[in-house]
Every structure is written in structure tokens, then in C-alpha cells.
């Protein structure tokens, strides 16, 4: 039987794999009380990446950021049904994940997911759906992930980095800045596991991107009130799905690690505290 876990090869410091993790967002403006199709934000796509003959990708989580309570629906001909698919009521300002932990939905190469929301009809109001996709073997990807057990075995120091993101008012990803712009205390030559994060202001999503993530965004919800949810976000994901999902960054790449977020039209700035664990070699 072929394993669906990521493939690994030998690396002097940690295992490298062909797996990839990506958070994507879709938005609509003044969508109204009836379900309306959302559009992927610039740089993202609702089409599942082509993994060739590899094991199917997985939708691990989804969440919303809405200004009027309504409904979210995500569907595909390859889901249980293409009529309602996954459908949830939404709550104003509730950015918490909607899917059960540890149970993923298979998604298939080139399938275009249909994302819909019903919510605010107020002119200019931006409503957002975000989702987190996992690819067990994505051709060309060179992202680096380890398991929670590996993090705990190699943990040396807890290390936090602060970035204040000037998020825009037009929706989509914005406010991107290098992770070392405001605080640069990284140890030369060190490897750091990103175990989680906290934010001080609500936003639809926050993400990190760089060479160590195969230049795909890895991230989660911008939930400011339930910090215990996000402080160990990647550890929680890994444990729930029994996968290596804790991103690892090299200090040498710090200038190329971008932190960014998705915000609505109100454009509130968000301070992100990235929570790293320095790893032994």
C-alpha cells in the first residue's frame, strides 16, 4: 500500500519533502442575502493545482470573515454532491475554522471549486472565504515541513517576531513585509519551525511565504480573540491530520520570508506575532 504521507529525502538539517500547503482566499463585495459566487483574490485560484498521478490533494480547513451573518457554500462535482456540497451558516466577525479537525475533503487536479457567500448588501462591504489546501506530492515544490514530534525533539528556544501589516482597503492579500524588517534577532545559520502565531486585530487570513514554503502562502485565520487556536496553529494541524505540516524556515532566507494578510474594506492594520521554535541541528 502506498503511503499518503509526504515523501522525504535526506537533508543535513531536516527532511525535505515534496508536500505543499497553501492558504487561498476568495472574496465578494456587497454580495447580498442570496448566495453569490466569489472570485479568488489576485494571485490565488479556486482551481486545484495539478498533482499528476500523485495522491489527491486535501482541503484541510475553511473559514469566513463576514460583516453580516449569512451562508457560505463550497461545492464541486467531486464532492458528496454538487448541489449544497459543504454549507454553513456564518457569524459576524467569527474567523474560526468550520471543518472538523482531522477529517479532510479530497480535492482533485484542475477541479475548479465553486465558492459562494450570502451576507452584507451594504455598498463596499467585502466578504471573504479562506481555505487551506494540502498537496502530498506537488511537482516542483520544495517546501520544508516537519512533525510536532520532530519539533519537540529538536526544540532549543521559543522565538517570536513581530510584524505590523499595513493592510489595504481593496481586499486581497496586502501589507506584505519581510519578516525581519521590524525585529531581526535570527541566529545565523539556524533553522526555525513556525508553530503558530497571534494577531491583535481581526482579519480574514495571515500567511507566510518564501523559498522554504515553495513560494506558496502557508497560514491561517486572523482570529484575534481565541489566541489558543492560532498560537499552535501548525502544530494543531499536524497532530489533527497526522501529517508533517509545521513549516521550517532557514535564518539565511529571512529577507525573503514575507508576512501578509487579507483584510476587508475597512483596512485595519494587524500586528502579527510569529511564534517560532529554534531547532537543534
Residue ranges of predicted features:
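Beta-strand-centric surfaces of beta-sandwich/beta-rich domains
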Residues: 1-281
Amino acid at each position: 500500500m502506498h503511503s499518503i504521507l509526504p515523501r522525504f529525502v535526506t537533508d543535513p538539517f531536516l527532511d525535505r519533502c515534496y508536500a505543499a500547503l497553501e492558504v487561498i482566499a476568495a472574496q465578494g463585495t456587497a454580495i447580498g442575502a442570496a448566495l453569490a459566487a466569489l472570485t479568488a483574490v489576485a494571485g490565488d485560484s479556486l482551481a486545484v493545482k495539478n498533482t499528476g498521478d500523485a495522491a489527491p490533494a486535501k482541503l484541510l480547513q475553511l473559514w469566513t470573515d463576514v460583516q453580516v451573518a449569512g451562508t457560505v457554500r463550497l461545492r464541486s462535482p467531486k464532492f458528496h454532491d454538487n448541489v449544497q456540497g459543504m454549507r454553513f451558516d456564518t457569524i459576524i466577525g467569527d474567523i474560526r475554522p468550520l471543518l472538523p479537525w482531522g477529517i479532510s475533503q479530497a480535492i482533485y487536479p484542475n477541479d475548479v471549486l465553486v465558492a459562494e457567500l450570502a451576507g452584507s448588501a451594504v455598498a463596499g462591504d467585502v466578504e471573504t472565504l479562506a481555505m487551506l489546501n494540502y498537496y502530498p506530492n506537488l511537482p516542483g515544490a520544495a517546501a520544508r515541513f516537519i512533525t510536532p514530534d520532530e519539533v519537540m525533539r529538536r526544540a532549543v528556544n521559543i522565538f517570536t517576531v513581530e510584524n505590523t501589516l499595513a493592510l489595504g482597503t481593496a481586499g486581497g492579500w496586502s501589507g506584505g513585509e519581510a519578516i525581519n524588517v521590524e525585529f531581526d534577532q535570527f541566529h545565523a545559520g539556524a533553522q526555525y519551525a513556525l508553530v503558530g502565531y497571534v494577531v491583535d486585530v481581526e482579519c480574514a487570513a495571515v500567511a507566510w511565504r518564501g523559498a522554504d514554503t515553495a513560494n506558496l502562502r502557508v497560514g491561517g485565520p486572523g482570529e484575534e480573540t481565541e489566541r489558543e487556536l492560532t498560537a499552535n496553529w501548525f502544530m494543531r494541524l499536524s497532530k489533527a491530520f497526522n501529517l508533517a505540516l509545521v513549516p521550517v524556515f532557514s535564518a539565511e532566507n529571512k529577507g525573503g520570508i514575507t508576512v501578509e494578510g487579507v483584510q476587508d474594506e475597512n483596512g485595519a492594520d494587524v500586528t502579527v506575532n510569529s511564534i517560532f521554535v529554534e531547532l537543534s541541528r
